[in-house]
Amino acid sequence: MVTKAHLDKVKSYVDLGLKEGAKLKVDGRGFRLQGYESGFFMGGCLFDEVTPDMRIYKEEIFGPVLSVVRAKTYEEALRLPSEHDYGNGVAIFTRDGDTARDFATRVNVGMVGVNFAIPVPLSYYTFGGWKRSGFGDLNQHGPDAVRFYTKTKTVTSRWPSGIKEGAEFVIPTMK
């Protein structure tokens, strides 16, 4: 992490997840990087049995904490991220191409990983956070970055027959 305050905040989410009843399968809170013991490092943490009523599900943690939310049906798996307040990203792991295409098309999030985690933070992937997960009015990479520096113009033309000279400055109406 960049600061001790952020490290402490992420660790507090892990503590909160345990208090709320999630099962911590991998605990990286004790990670130390040799030679950098005073740094703000934390190993990965993996929660299982996370439910939508838990804060670790409801809030974006911005740290190495992954939550597994189990869905009973495909439609529930599609609905959970689509109805979440944040629309940053989701991953689906499947061997069924039709299911992957359907999920990627229907899910209401900005980034979808199929058979691998969400493709960030590599700069050549577009950041597509949606809903409360977006930052600003444009995405930071990809077409929106180009649009930010582009001046666009819309021209609407109409060339009716019968006007020989002069100009008309009225909206045509049906007679």
Where are the regions that the model predicts?
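Short beta-strand segments
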Residues: K25-G28, I92
